[in-house]
Every structure is written in C-alpha cells, then in structure tokens.
Amino acid sequence: MYSIKCDDNKAMPRERLMRLGAESLSNQELLAILLRTGNKEKHVLELSSYLLSHLDSLADFKKMSLQELQHLAGIGKVKAIEIKAMIELVSRILATDKTLTDSVLTSVQVAEKMMAALGDKKQEHLVVLYLDNQNRIFEEKTIFIGTVRRSLAEPREILYYACKNMATSLIVIHNHPSGNIEPSSNDYCFTEKIKRSCEDLGIICLDHIIVSYKDYYSFREKSTLF
C-alpha cells in the first residue's frame, strides 16, 4: 500500500506551494489542491490521503478508468474527469519533451517512450514516428485507434503523412491491450506490407514495434523481416 503521513499542523497546500514551491509539497498535498474540497466525512487532506492509501503507486492513477476513480469515496464525476485530464496532460508534456527533438538511436529508446504512452490503453493504437535525414523525429502521428471491425491501418494512411512532410524514414508502433506482445500473423503481414510500400517510395521503415505496459517486441531485433 502507498504510505501516507497526515499532519494536521501543516499549513494549507495552496499557501505552502506559494511560499515554498510545488516541489516542496507531498503527493498528498498536491492531490488535495486538485481535489479542492473534501466531503462531509473528510477534510480535503484526509480525502487525498485516503485515495492515495488505496494505490500501490502513483502510476495506478494512469491505469484507472473514470468509473474506477468515481467508485472511490468522495470522488464524483467532475473530480474524476479533472484528475484524468491532469494525468493525460502530464503524459503529453513528458512525451513531447523527451523525444520530439531527439535522434533515434535504438529500438529500446523508442519502445520505452511508447510503452509509457500506450501501455495502459484499452484499445489498439497505431502511432508512427516520422524522421528526417539526420534521424531526428519531427512528427509523431496517431494514425488510428482500433475498433471491433478494424485492425491496424493501411500503408497509404501511414505513407500519406510521410510524403506530405518529406520524411526520410519512419517507425511504426502499436500496442497490444491484452499485454501479450507476441506478434500475430496479421502483424507479420502488415509489417511486410508497410516495409514493401515504403521501399517503393524510397522511404526507410526502420522498425515495427509492439508494446504493452511492461514489455515490447521489435521486428528489427527479433524477426527476419529487417
């Protein structure tokens, strides 16, 4: 369980943040600022302490759905939405800051970024990283989000943005919501198809990576397709 210490003698979190800076606040205090108010049974600091005590780590917030958040005592629809919005914004800030201007060196670096971004998604997402002639990522594009009737994407959707932005190479990534990273026969067929289509246009397909929350599969590292 997440260990929480509650100190009734502390000043209110907003005042402490103004005086000491956000980095000086505890997780309990930062969450209390987001919640703003408590409920009939608990002061806002007690409520934030209660919520954190039900988590093994802060990362559990990212994995929880709106419905799961609302089931926690004192969390209504509005507060649950605000927490999810905050978590998503932080994820996007970290993803942008970490990789958009970096040169790609290994499949591991790409996989680690995309495991954090896609590992907890309940639907299949296909994302493409487009690179320039200096191997720098200049665009990250979500090509599609899977539905019951559709799996993965057509090469033309991926290559449209490559041609539009004069990409030299690209990396394809998609997640397996089941957590099983082993490629299916459809994954192999798709990889062959997109690699061949890229070659026809003089674009290099550097890799196709499948990710889950904790692991990844790189076709470049583990298959004979590259």
UniProtKB/Swiss-Prot annotation:
Motif JAMM motif in this chain: 174-187
Keyword NAD: no
InterPro entries in UniProt: MPN, RadC_JAB, RuvA_2-like, UPF0758, UPF0758_CS, UPF0758_N
PROSITE patterns hit by this protein: MPN, UPF0758
Residues annotated for Zn(2+) binding in this entry: 174, 176, 187
Tree of life domain: Bacteria
Keywords: Hydrolase, Metal-binding, Metalloprotease, Protease, Zinc
Domain MPN: 103-225
Pfam families listed in its UniProt record: RadC, UPF0758_N
Molecular function as annotated in GO: metal ion binding; metallopeptidase activity
UniProt similarity note: Belongs to the UPF0758 family.
Protein name per Swiss-Prot or TrEMBL: UPF0758 protein M28_Spy0816
Species in which this protein is naturally found: Streptococcus pyogenes serotype M28 (strain MGAS6180)
Biological classification of the source: Bacteria, Bacillati, Bacillota, Bacilli, Lactobacillales
